[in-house]
Amino acid sequence: MLGAPDESSVRVAVRIRPQLAKEKIEGCHICTSVTPGEPQVFLGKDKAFTFDYVFDIDSQQEQIYIQCIEKLIEGCFEGYNATVFAYGQTGAGKTYTMGTGFDVNIVEEELGIISRAVKHLFKSIEEKKHIAIKNGLPAPDFKVNAQFLELYNEEVLDLFDTTRDIDAKSKKSNIRIHEDSTGGIYTVGVTTRTVNTESEMMQCLKLGALSRTTASTQMNVQSSRSHAIFTIHVCQTRVCPQIDADNATDNKIISESAQMNEFETLTAKFHFVDLAGSERLKRTGATGERAKEGISINCGLLALGNVISALGDKSKRATHVPYRDSKLTRLLQDSLGGNSQTIMIACVSPSDRDFMETLNTLKYANRARNIKNKVMVNQDRASQQINALRSEITRLQMELMEYKTGKRIIDEEGVESINDMFHENAMLQTENNNLRVRIKAMQETVDALRSRITQLVSDQANHVLARAGEGNEEISNMIHSYIKEIEDLRAKLLESEAVNENLRKNLTRATARAPYFSGSSTFSPTILSSDKETIEIIDLAKKDLEKLKRKEKRKKKRLQKLEESNREERSVAGKEDNTDTDQEKKEEKGVSERENNELEVEESQEVSDHEDEEEEEEEEEDDIDGGESSDESDSESDEKANYQADLANITCEIAIKQKLIDELENSQKRLQTLKKQYEEKLMMLQHKIRDTQLERDQVLQNLGSVESYSEEKAKKVRSEYEKKLQAMNKELQRLQAAQKEHARLLKNQSQYEKQLKKLQQDVMEMKKTKVRLMKQMKEEQEKARLTESRRNREIAQLKKDQRKRDHQLRLLEAQKRNQEVVLRRKTEEVTALRRQVRPMSDKVAGKVTRKLSSSDAPAQDTGSSAAAVETDASRTGAQQKMRIPVARVQALPTPATNGNRKKYQRKGLTGRVFISKTARMKWQLLERRVTDIIMQKMTISNMEADMNRLLKQREELTKRREKLSKRREKIVKENGEGDKNVANINEEMESLTANIDYINDSISDCQANIMQMEEAKEEGETLDVTAVINACTLTEARYLLDHFLSMGINKGLQAAQKEAQIKVLEGRLKQTEITSATQNQLLFHMLKEKAELNPELDALLGHALQDLDSVPLENVEDSTDEDAPLNSPGSEGSTLSSDLMKLCGEVKPKNKARRRTTTQMELLYADSSELASDTSTGDASLPGPLTPVAEGQEIGMNTETSGTSAREKELSPPPGLPSKIGSISRQSSLSEKKIPEPSPVTRRKAYEKAEKSKAKEQKHSDSGTSEASLSPPSSPPSRPRNELNVFNRLTVSQGNTSVQQDKSDESDSSLSEVHRSSRRGIINPFPASKGIRAFPLQCIHIAEGHTKAVLCVDSTDDLLFTGSKDRTCKVWNLVTGQEIMSLGGHPNNVVSVKYCNYTSLVFTVSTSYIKVWDIRDSAKCIRTLTSSGQVTLGDACSASTSRTVAIPSGENQINQIALNPTGTFLYAASGNAVRMWDLKRFQSTGKLTGHLGPVMCLTVDQISSGQDLIITGSKDHYIKMFDVTEGALGTVSPTHNFEPPHYDGIEALTIQGDNLFSGSRDNGIKKWDLTQKDLLQQVPNAHKDWVCALGVVPDHPVLLSGCRGGILKVWNMDTFMPVGEMKGHDSPINAICVNSTHIFTAADDRTVRIWKARNLQDGQISDTGDLGEDIASN
């Protein structure tokens, strides 16, 4: 690690959203205020909260991003994790702030945090690459990945997973959450998208946002029903940043590493968390799935609040943090208290309606500020270790340098201190700097004097030449340059001598250190050859001197003769000779000095190279010593660390020693290079010597050409050559010393080789140790695996035992329920027998009806009270059973403590009295604390209830004021301001305003009281319960536990008694309400009969009905239009009972269908009406409106199974219906939908007929009396129990089996299924029924033969093809009405079938295979095509005898196929593409791509010859169009996307002319124009369930649609208006197909119905009432 992790607190920002228009209309006040310029928010009047950031109502998205998030994105590039999560109640603006909602039409100013962060991220990436390239560094490499998770109902879902089923959200996901060794959280099984650009990232965000679960509640139109976590992983590889120059000067390793770039890898992850809002079911009005989602959301947020409390409370930091209580807290574990820079955005509402939610949010946010995160850089291990080692080396080198320089010393006692020499050294350095400045000034002076001397000497020489008459400008310039060069060379000579002196000192010091490296010196042949050459040069120089001496003697003789002849000429000639010789001497001297300087410089370079080499070797030795010491320290740490740490250390040491070996090899190579350079320099010096000889010969020749020489000139030449010889001798000595140094270096090479071998041996030993440790680790892992498997077996055994116990418990519970049912039945029979004791005539019964209705109440009260007594008794028994373990727990310690009683008795009583007193005091403290907490919570709860009541009152008053305002405006428009009604309305509005103001003041006072209670609760926690419990002794703890147990039992008993009392009172209240409702119904029916003759009574009755209709319904759902009451005069009688039941609160929220008119039995007896209502709501699988129970039973008894028509079969109840009405289940299956009921007029007609038939049956009854009108229906006769098992009966109630099989009570289901599978299918005529003539279609035949649901259908005029879940495709002859053949051998369901008229081939689809059948001779599979484009001759699936669910790797599920009109091309929808097949060659030619989700349906049309038009619909909600020409190859992109898309996946497509019709899972149908490619019309809620199939009625401009609820609807294509609807099947309709005359519909009820169109007049039907009657009857 680079260092210790930094402490970073969780930063908190509060954002207050603006008030909604609805809140303003309802008069909600703002209860929050923000201090200007300060991050402080006030709630209520004076309760202040301080946070890191506070954003008021008018804050913008950009402001929030810049202040909060921008720094976190920059931190990601430095390797720091970051988390942003939005917290708050539902509808507080979390999704808007985070930007996960993803609205297409959003403006740039309203972009959320995620969109801005993505833009900032990729912009910074480009900038960093540009800066690196500009600085000449390699561009950093960035890898950006994205994940999008959804936590829905405590299940982690992958929003990027396009293969998962969107409807299977409740299933358990395969995503697992794990924790790594550093405490980081990562997920397994999540799709990770690699992203390169900003647009790709936004596309990923859009894809995930569309897949996220949202729904509408009363508080929010589009409420998030899950927690969303959008994670961006950034991995960058960049050049390590440069280290300071001060450290790099003394550190050679760092200087070398600076020359070659070192890279480091940094990783960071950024969580964007959009939490679902906390919500209250009362306010959201959620039921069913929404309620379950809300509970799951609140559970996750509760766990998050507990984690925040545990981390934020300083007193609880040492305790356990419950991260594992929820998957939400588990995913955010490293964001809360871990390695992350976290910011929490608390979104709150300013309205006083949300006061409590805002208070709780601010309290949690305030607590979250105390959370401390440990932030560290996420660096790869190699870079971390290298940086750690580099910093350690730097520190050690600095310390070593301080010891070397004397700054640090250790005295005799081992104490480290600073040396006084350090201060002296600092003073000397200061003096040195001053002297350096003086030297620089003196150097400038010397340069100036040198230039002046050069000028003076050149002027003197020019003057001499001018006197001689031979001077010109060229000669003077040449003399000036020579003199200047001579002065420069003289200065260089002095510098070289000084450098030479310094190098000699260094050489002396190096030779003094030479004994450290022992060994014999060897001379290379190059050095020996250079010695010989030097000796030869010296001999030649001696010979030249002898020659010069002889010539000098001759010159002297000749000079004497010349002096005598003419002294003047001789003097002039002597002067000229002197000037020439001076110039020659100067030139020779300059050349010799230049050569000497070059030799000295080269020699100094050589010596400096040797010195550098020595320094490198010394540093390498230091490194080796440091490595050995680090090896020793590592070996000591290996004994203490575990196997993993040992392995990492050994790997690191191997790498370090391998690096040292490489360094030694490099130094060896440098030594060879140095030797080579040394020999090259010797050769260069020999060449210079030769040049000097040539120059000497030239000088001698020049001297020989001169006729007269003086003796002085000879002496000068001799002395000059002697100097040269001396210089050469010195150079020879210097070269010999360098030769010795080279020999010493060669001797040291053997030592380096020994060290290299030693290090290699160490590396091999470490590798062996590593292998041994790996083996040990594997053994330990194997042991752990065996232990884990043994534990898993034990756990499995325990689970098995637990399941057995649970099974036994369920059996006992079922037995108990059966006993209760029998007891209830007997009680009912006894009651019925008592009522039958005194029979009455019809006349008397009619007179006494009212009295009976009123007098039955006490009897029913007694019955209900008796039932309550029974339930109390059963509950008391259960409580006694539950108390048995407690008694056992209390009795268990008794034997153990009996032996110790004598000891306690021997002791005095003083100790026990003292202990009991202290324990009693502690118990009183704890009890008082518990009571205070309960009272505080009750007080706050009461205050909150009062505030909610005030809010409701204010809402009602506001609505009344709004109505009065509208009424006033209307009156003013009609009559003007002078109307007296306006004044009355004004007065009423003023009083309402005063009431609203008073309520607002009361709300403010209530809020202030709540705040005071919260403060008192926080300040009043003076008693530390934890400290009291920790201070308890064992005896005191037992005493406290005993009292707590007793108090818990007492409280539980009191709660149970209160609950029993409440249930008894509720039962009485309900009974009273039912009695009242019955009386009201009788009263209104009697009044209604008389109202026909009395107009005044009719008017009064009409007003009463209007008042009933105006009663508000709080429990009724308002999601669909079915719930709106019909107040037409014709429906008064039918809606009367439902209105009365609304008054009594008896309307059940899930029953959307209005209740039918009550019968006389239900009017007289509340029990029968309740049972009938239960029957109507309990069994939703009945095909129509249920008849009364007695009628249903009579039909069931009097109707024979063999002679029953299909129509009567639909009316009779299924065998799954229990024989006793009281045991009817009140819960219908989730998959079934409510069946629409007929209009009130039709219902009234139907039940008048039912009442007449019932009266006739009563006349012909055996008793001969009208006891049926007085007594409730008796128990039905016992029927033979159905042989179906529980699961089959459940399946029957869900409507997934055939109706005909359900009706055969005596038949065995398994046998019938075997017979059905063995015999061939047949097409039977469908019996005609009354009332069906009104529907545009008439069912004429029904095809039966499949054993499971029929999924697909295709037909010609003569043949019918059906595919089913029973893995077969059947071929039917429409002429004979029989099954021709069955095409089997499919691995799974047959999901699509197509027939080609031109080739007589049948194509069937199952999983990822397309089978091609030739049915001309027999059912033979000739080829098998796969989704990946492979072709197999014959049947590739024949080996699979059982059902195969798994799809081979590389293949995809094929959902549907389609043929082009000419039958030459086949198109198969597999995955998110459509594969094209050329049927002439049976080869795959390409794919149609473009969809993001699986393609569910497609249709093909022909534009022109050789050009096909393909329309595809996908689960991604989009419809795409492709134009494919003949011969098209490869990937084909869509030519058009139809906009706007559906709200859910597409299930059906059909083309009619230039129009396209699409049906979707969003229950809607859309009509598109293919020429203009526009949306023409749409019906949003065309059906109440998924639109699964579409078709066109032959020879009529009519569209037919079928839904998952089994409903068929007919639409006019031109106006797109509904023509009619009918219950086509009792189960989901899967496919619709047409030929030239008929329509075929396939459904889950294993049948295919054949329909024929009636004569339609413009597609309209006049009598909708008959249509409704038809629907009801069918």
Curated annotation (Swiss-Prot):
Record keywords: Acetylation, ATP-binding, Cell projection, Coiled coil, Cytoplasm, Cytoskeleton, Disease variant, Microtubule, Motor protein, Nucleotide-binding, Phosphoprotein, Repeat, WD repeat
Annotated Polar residues bias: 851-865, 1128-1138, 1170-1179, 1196-1205, 1288-1297
Residues binding ATP: 88-95
Membrane-spanning ranges: none
Location within or outside the cell: Cytoplasm, Cytoskeleton; Cytoplasm, Cell cortex; Cell projection, Axon; Cell projection, Dendrite
Residue span of region Interaction with KANK1 and KANK2: 1146-1167
Region annotation Disordered: where it falls in the sequence: 556-641, 779-804, 841-881, 1116-1138, 1170-1318
Consequence of substituting residue 1154 to A: Very weak binding affinity for KANK1 and KANK2
BP GO annotations: anterograde axonal transport; cortical microtubule organization; microtubule-based movement; regulation of axon guidance; regulation of microtubule depolymerization; regulation of microtubule polymerization
Effect of substituting residue 28 to W: In CFEOM1; prevents the interaction between the motor domain and the coiled-coil domain, expected to cause loss of autoinhibition and gain of function
Skewed-composition ranges (Acidic residues): 598-637
Comp. bias (Basic and acidic residues): 560-597, 1245-1262
Domain notes: The coiled coil region interacts with the kinesin motor domain leading to autoinhibition of the motor.
Quaternary state and interactors: Part of a cortical microtubule stabilization complex (CMSC) composed of KANK1, PPFIA1, PPFIBP1, ERC1/ELKS, PHLDB2/LL5beta, CLASPs, KIF21A and possibly additional interactors; within CMSCs KANK1 and PHLDB2/LL5beta seem to be the core components for recruiting microtubule-binding proteins KIF21A and CLASPs, whereas PPFIA1, PPFIBP1 and ERC1/ELKS serve as scaffolds for protein clustering. Interacts (via residues 1146-1167) with KANK1 (via ankyrin repeats 1-5) and KANK2 (via ankyrin repeats 1-5).
Function field: Processive microtubule plus-end directed motor protein involved in neuronal axon guidance. Is recruited by KANK1 to cortical microtubule stabilizing complexes (CMSCs) at focal adhesions (FAs) rims where it promotes microtubule capture and stability. Controls microtubule polymerization rate at axonal growth cones and suppresses microtubule growth without inducing microtubule disassembly once it reaches the cell cortex.
Disease linkage: Fibrosis of extraocular muscles, congenital, 1: A congenital ocular motility disorder marked by restrictive ophthalmoplegia affecting extraocular muscles innervated by the oculomotor and/or trochlear nerves. It is clinically characterized by anchoring of the eyes in downward gaze, ptosis, and backward tilt of the head. Patients affected by congenital fibrosis of extraocular muscles type 1 show an absence of the superior division of the oculomotor nerve (cranial nerve III) and corresponding oculomotor subnuclei.
Official protein name in the record: Kinesin-like protein KIF21A
Organism (species): Homo sapiens (Human)
Lineage, uppermost ranks: Eukaryota, Metazoa, Chordata, Craniata, Vertebrata
